[in-house]
A protein has these predicted regions:
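A short glycine-rich, Lys/Arg-flanked "PGG" loop and its adjoining helix->strand segment in the class I
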Residues: 118-130
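Class I SAM-dependent methyltransferase Rossmann-like catalytic core
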Residues: 1-17
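Helix-to-beta-strand junctions that scaffold the AdoMet/dcAdoMet cofactor pocket
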Residues: 48, 112-114, 128-130
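Conserved SAM-binding loop of SAM-dependent methyltransferases across substrates and taxa
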Residues: 37-49
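Conserved class I S-adenosyl-L-methionine
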Residues: 26-36, 54
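Conserved beta-strand signature within the Rossmann-like core of class I S-adenosyl-L-methionine
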Residues: 131-138
Length: 175
């Protein structure tokens, strides 16, 4: 497998921090946008044993990840029956509106070439159920994402009830 939760790697800590910020009861469906090797999808399934977790990824030529690798990794962690992996595009998710209780993404959106980041976020929010939880962990540079405080206010104006921007760098990296 191409990841290891117990190896003391930084991504294990990042995943724990991302998931620790979710106010989620563990029921229903989780979507990970840009699942790569499946590590965060699998960590979510391990954290919430009643949840069904779907990981989507483009699996382009840049990284050596694939659907088959994700499925192998999920099987090795004993969660294959609750994890589904499928090819997908973060710019146009192939799910109906309000399909998921939780949508998560970890260090993915900055890799989506030619995307308007705020439109990309709105696409992820489109598949989130009302009252659901969205967590994005990424390099939130203003020149890439624009004014995120303004975007957070736009989301509030659109009816999203709780919108928080949380800097997790200290928790995840200790810096």
């Amino acid at each position: 497998r191409q990841y290891a939760f117990g190896g003391g790697g930084i991504m294990e800590q990042v995943h724990r921090v991302v998931l620790s910020h979710l106010d989620y009861d563990g029921e229903g469906k989780i979507l990970e946008v840009g699942c790569g090797s499946g590590a965060l999808t699998i960590r979510s399934a391990l954290t919430w044993p009643k949840a069904k977790v779907i990981g989507v990824d483009y699996w382009g030529a840049v990284y050596n990840y694939s659907k088959a690798l994700c499925e192998k990794n999920a099987a090795s962690e004993g969660v294959a029956s609750r994890c589904v992996f499928q090819h997908g595009d973060a710019k146009q998710l192939d799910f109906p509106d309000e399909s998921f209780d939780v949508v998560i993404s970890n260090y993915v959106y900055h890799n989506v070439m030619g995307a308007d980041m705020q439109k990309l976020l709105l696409e992820s929010l489109r598949v989130l159920k009302k009252g659901g939880v969205f967590a994005l962990n990424d390099d939130m540079k203003p020149k890439m994402y624009g004014d995120m405080e303004g975007f957070a206010q736009k989301l509030r104006d659109m009816g999203y009830e709780e919108v928080r921007l949380v800097d997790t760098a200290q928790e995840a990296f200790g810096s």
